[in-house]
Amino acid sequence: MRAFFAVPLVDSLRPALAAVQEDLRAVGAAVSWVSPDSLHMTLKFLGEVPENSRFDLRPPAPFDLELAGVGEFGGRVAWAGCRGALDPLRELAAQAEAAGERAGVPRETRPFSPHVTIGRIRSNRNLDKLRARMARWKEQVFGTWPVRRAVLFRSETSPSGSVYKVVAEYPCIAT
């Protein structure tokens, strides 16, 4: 199965990001927008792993993030940013990285950069317009994101895009 660890976005924040996507879509840039129902923060992409894979993940105590700001990575990914309790989030990402490594998945070479991918930029068409429109959202605070669990998702591709199915849940437990 093609799988990844993630923190699912809480439902209360989906409409705000859908509104951002709609605003950005208006500039006509070549972007494949992520369905609001599929928005999440990837902790570790595992790629293909055996169906019967089991992972040991022990999330920290529940914590809160703030979903804020919009930007892009290198003309390839449109994102919404996070701030707030980043230490427990980084701990959770490090655990996901270690769990993947124990399963034979190569370690990520780039540092963890907390974000929610809202779209994948396909070409430079109207990229300058997209960046200018993103600047409107740079300081926007979308709301509090209570992190209460991490999830192992299976990613299934279809003609209409990827579909994510929960394989396992790892609740945040206060110690």
Regions from the PLM with identified roles:
Residues M1-T175:
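Histidine-dependent nucleotide/RNA phosphoesterase domain, centered on the 2H-phosphoesterase fold
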